[in-house]
Design a protein with these regions (language model features):
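Feature captures the catalytic ectodomains and active-site-proximal regions of enzymes
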Residues: 1-407
């Protein structure tokens, strides 16, 4: 009933699409030195790797006004409101970034086991409860660890356990040897064990793979499953849901929030699939609320794998889809394009980088856009969404609405 009432009301924007180009940061944060990330700049360095990047739609929205990106010009009259956002929370991971967009300030970083691997007590208990031998237990690239341990995992029907610079426990197993449901069962056990304070991680991730040997193993992204912690407090998504608004999620958003505040979700297998599903909602679904989208391949396929040319080409491909998206927008639609952290594909190591993120905000109803002052938190995104729908935020959520877009 509430949802029907909301659809009959008129808001500045009936449908808001928040698209996260996962890891596409625009330069080091002021505190980047504390994270070992001085000099990181995902957009700029990806663009440099191909000489000049061609992203005409995002260029017209003011992307080039935010940073010096080879091939992306500054524009005198951007079509969108454009700004950079700093991260208040103490982290540079997926959960921390997305949670902050929806108002959550993560004061204490999630626990990581990058240098040490997981404690023997945890590994022993996980092996006992799952009934599988565990191999690995170190920080690694997901593709590299399959080359090293994938054949052994198949022979023994063991489980490959590994981590990264993020607060994650990842379990890889062959889909045809271990089976998908068995992998999920083992990950559910790991999630329960990793609720203990001394072992608590932000996410447990099921990483199924296929192939016959180390030269052709590859992960099955569509069958990946994240077992995340739930935010301790209600987020902006909960407030929307509780007031009868649609919170439609595309990609891994539902997993990141552990389903909290989500009214419907669609998993994706690629950036293209994510944009296909998002544009389908734009063209064919009438709703009042938000469509929250994560496009993970920038991060998983090109950032972590330190493939700057691939990253640049993926950004160019995304820009074409942005153009397609814009062509189908209604005057009462709003598009927000952003990122959740950096992952400079030219940087040392294989992990995320502490960077500011771009925020491009566009509607066909805008008479003109302009560059806004840098925001001190990603929380301006959720705050602006609630402002649009006339909803009050909880006092413990961070971020102020960007009221300029309603002028």
């Amino acid at each position: 009933m509430e949802e029907m009432q909301n659809m009959s009301k008129k808001y500045p924007f009936q449908r808001i699409f928040l698209i996260v180009a996962d890891s596409a940061g625009v330069g080091e944060e002021p505190d980047a030195a504390e994270f070992g990330d001085c000099g990181s700049n995902t957009w700029k360095h990806a663009a440099e790797s191909v000489g000049q990047i061609r992203v005409p739609y995002m260029e017209s929205m003011g992307l080039g006004d935010l940073d010096d990106i080879p091939g992306v010009s500054k524009v005198d009259h951007p079509k969108a409101y454009c700004l950079t956002c700093r991260e208040t929370s103490r982290g540079k991971d997926t959960m921390t970034g997305h949670w902050e967009m929806m108002g959550v300030n993560t004061v204490k970083p999630f626990q990581t086991f990058t240098e040490t691997g997981f404690p023997k007590e945890l590994m022993d208990e996980l092996s006992r409860q799952t009934g599988h031998k565990l191999i690995g237990n170190y920080s690694a690239s997901g593709t590299e660890i399959l080359r090293v341990l994938g054949e052994e995992q198949m022979k023994e029907n063991s489980l490959i356990v590994y981590t990264s610079a993020d607060s994650v426990l990842q379990i890889a197993a062959h889909e045809e040897v271990t089976g998908l449901q068995e992998l999920y069962r083992c990950c559910e056990i790991a999630r329960r064990l990793c609720m203990k304070p001394e072992w608590k991680v932000g996410r447990v991730i099921a990483r199924p793979y296929v192939g016959t040997n180390k030269n052709d193993f590859h992960r099955v992204g569509g069958d990946r499953h994240d077992y995340a912690l739930s935010p301790e407090e209600d987020t902006d998504m909960n407030i929307l849901e509780q007031n009868g608004f649609t919170v439609s999620c595309v990609g891994k958003i539902c997993d990141i929030f552990n389903g909290k505040g989500v009214t419907e979700t669609q998993h994706t297998v690629s950036n293209e699939d994510g944009m296909d599903k998002t544009i389908d909602q734009l063209k064919n679904k009438d709703f009042t609320g938000i469509c929250f989208v994560n496009l993970v391949e920038f991060d998983s396929e090109f950032g972590h794998r330190r493939n700057p040319v691939g990253y640049a080409r993926a950004l160019e491909a995304f820009d074409k889809r942005v153009g397609e998206f814009i062509s189908h927008m209604r005057d009462d639609d709003l598009l927000m394009i952003t990122a959740d952290h950096g992952n400079d594909p030219t940087f040392h190591g294989t992990d995320h980088t502490r960077e500011k993120v771009p925020l491009l905000i566009y509607s066909p109803s805008f008479k003109k856009g302009r560059q806004l002052e840098e925001a001190p938190t990603f929380g301006v995104m959720g705050a602006t969404i609630l402002e649009n729908f006339g909803l009050k935020r909880n006092d413990d959520l961070i971020g102020e609405p960007l009221k300029e877009i309603f002028e």
